[in-house]
Design a protein with these regions (language model features):
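ATP-binding N-terminal substructure of ATP-dependent carboxylate-amine bond-forming enzymes
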Residues: 1-115, 148-159
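Short catalytic-loop micro-motif centered on adjacent basic/acidic residues
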Residues: 13-14, 84-86, 140-143, 217-218
């Protein structure tokens, strides 16, 4: 059965090519029967070749000049439409929010984001938890591992890991998700379910050896 599309007063423009972009495009289609314009870095991934998506790869789409040229060009070409601009990933959200703050987006672009300074606070996990503490919002018990805790060999000292007072398995994730993906390494994940002490030591070692410098949240 062929998909049916409806002309609307808006066009979804999504940045990213992974499952997040596909999921947002699918939500737009299911609710409004519209096709989303999606821009990702590579000609692969869940968003590529989807029937509900018009996908364009551009390896530099995550840079400010290319992103602005792309989305403002779409806005100009569809001046009678509202362009709903959505970043499908922390780096794209940050990019769009900064452009919005600087008033660099065309007038018919809607970017549904708070000021970048506020987003930055929420994206950094340890700051987010501090805000939860301040406002009485429950959150999981955490331990923050910093790069300064490493020993001279670039490893997590036993006396530091002994301070972690909750059992395995435990979840480990980077505080700065944007920086995290800028330093790729073998076995890298968005979040880890750490089974034991040996795995914890390995993930910490690999994370900082890659060039990542921000905190790890356990």
């Amino acid at each position: 059965m062929a998909l049916q599309f409806t002309e609307r007063e808006f066009i979804p423009v999504l940045l990213g090519g992974d499952i997040n972009a596909y999921s947002v495009a699918r939500a737009f289609y299911e609710e409004y029967q519209v096709k989303s314009l999606v821009f990702g870095k590579y000609q692969t991934g869940p968003a590529y070749r989807s029937q509900i998506i018009d996908y364009t790869p551009n390896v530099d789409i995550d840079t400010m000049p290319v992103m602005l040229k792309t989305v403002n060009g779409i806005a100009q070409a569809h001046a009678d439409k509202t362009i709903v601009l959505v970043g499908c990933g922390d780096n794209y959200v940050a990019l769009v929010a900064q452009a919005k703050d600087a008033h660099e987006l065309a007038d018919n672009i809607v970017a549904p984001y708070a000021p970048y300074s506020m987003l930055e606070q929420c994206q950094k996990k340890e700051i987010f938890y501090e805000l939860c503490e301040k406002h009485g919002v429950p959150y999981p018990h955490t331990f923050t591992f910093t790069k300064a805790m490493l020993n001279a060999q670039g490893e997590a000292p036993a006396e530091v890991l002994d301070q972690i007072d909750f059992p395995y398995p435990m979840i480990l994730k980077p505080s700065d998700g944007i920086m995290w993906w800028q330093h790729e390494f073998e076995g890298q994940k968005k979040a880890y379910e750490i089974a034991d002490r040996a795995e914890l030591e390995q993930v910490i070692r690999d994370s900082y050896a890659s060039g990542y410098t921000d905190d790890l949240i356990l």
